Amino acid sequence: MKILYCDCFAGIAGDMTVAALLDLGVPFEVVEGAVKQLPLPHSSYSLAVERTSRKGIAAARFVVHVEEHQPHRHYADIAAMIEESTLAEGVKEKAQRIFFRLAEAEAKVHGVEIGRVHFHEVGAVDSIVDIVGTAAALEWLGIDAVHAAPLPLGSGFVETAHGRLPVPAPATAELLRGLPIHGEAGSGERVTPTGAAILAALATGFGRAPAMTVTGVGCGAGTKDFDDIPNVMRLFMGEAEGGLLRDEVCIIETHIDDMNPEILGHVLERLMEAGALDAAFSPLQMKKNRPAVKLTVIARPGQRDELAALVLRETSAIGVRFYPASRLKLSREKEERPTSLGPVTVKVIRDGGRVVRVTPEYDACRRIAAEREMSLLEVYRIVEREAGEP
């Protein structure tokens, strides 16, 4: 079980994250190649990695140069850009989750629908590069779980496309809902919206580092050079002790007996889009012998209030209950394997270093079935036969 622990003692930003992943050993070509798979004019930006130091700590610095004149981009445009690219499914999924959390926060702050969220022209390219680069690097490393230290709040003001705003910026503050913070770091912006979105979307645990054997350390430098502490984020990569990974989640439940069942499927889709780890309906019999369903949502602890509010907004429920739970999980990662139908994404499940089973990835098989006008069952059989060997 491969774990990545983000030591954010000075904060986190998108470029710091990519830089730390590169310092951890991810080839620069992995990040550059992923960005090149997006429909962005290659002449409109350039990427580079440099060696630098902050307060005597050697670190990598990820530099993105962007032309000033860029087209207006809304969240819907960026989401379509990622989905229609040739990126691996695992990279797409991570990037979409991060951008959704970022756009959701911006939508709430500015009071607009999420599809109409507008990213500042130059900042949009920066965010796209940082988010897709992070997703590609994590996929290349085969990270199973991301954990992070509590985040420094920072203080003061920051200059943005919307003017001078308090630290943390409003979108960052929204993304910090449910995440642990502290005020020990000094003044200035310590957590950027992109950095907060990465952890809000991907981190499954916050606090002390989980028990693991460290196999790599990476340091990523931020743009600024703070007076008080080195502006560096450290990443610790390691193997969890034993074959199982333990993490903490929140279970959200409610009973529904008076709602049009046609809407229930939409509710599940909204929950998964919002970052729920899982969601399901189960049948039950309620008072007055009413047939009903129980909605169960598995969420990261920091998502509790957000997802509970979504349930109350999207269903006829007038209350929810929630409680913490612990999980034990097997390691799983996505791989592309060759088949007679072309490269297909499969899920490889491991117990420690031993492969337990290999299962076809539903979305990849569904796409092949549609493209080749085959039944999904037939595609599954072929993939299981040709790519399902451990």
UniProtKB/Swiss-Prot annotation:
Pfam families: Ni_insertion. Keywords: Nickel. The keyword Transit peptide does not apply. GO terms for molecular function: lyase activity; nickel cation binding. The keyword Transferase does not apply. It comes from the Bacteria. InterPro entries: Ni_insertion. Belongs to the LarC family. This is Putative nickel insertion protein. It comes from Geobacter metallireducens (strain ATCC 53774 / DSM 7210 / GS-15).
